[in-house]
Amino acid sequence: MIQTQSMLDVADNSGARRVMCIKVLGGSHRRYAGIGDIIKVTVKEAIPRGKVKKGQVMTAVVVRTRHGVRRPDGSIIRFDGNAAVLLNNKQEPIGTRIFGPVTRELRTEKFMKIVSLAPEVL
């Protein structure tokens, strides 16, 4: 569960390393975001010569959370950390590679590009 002020790792090669959630999108006064939800983030840590710079405000999709996601069969998939993938204005990933596993819940029309780039889908 990601909320405002939550710090996330970046799971792509866009140049950002750490981002902070500044808004959970999708309804007024929405408090938490889970896997597959879109959030507004600000870049807190970035590498030199990356596509994004420190201080930029971006859109991102949550791909991994410590809280995890519950499947219809009752199983829960949890991760060691929270991670997001940065998106452009057309909701496409900025990076060309995805690091680490992503969940099957991202297999919607919007995020098929992220699923196809990911090395492992759980």
From Swiss-Prot:
Entry-linked SUPFAM superfamilies: Ribosomal protein L14
Gene Ontology MF terms in the entry: large ribosomal subunit rRNA binding; structural constituent of ribosome
Transmembrane segments: none
PROSITE patterns: RIBOSOMAL_L14
Signal peptide range: none
Functional description taken from the UniProt entry: Binds to 23S rRNA. Forms part of two intersubunit bridges in the 70S ribosome.
Database matches in NCBIfam families: rplN_bact
Name of the protein described by the UniProt record: Large ribosomal subunit protein uL14
This protein's encoding gene: rplN
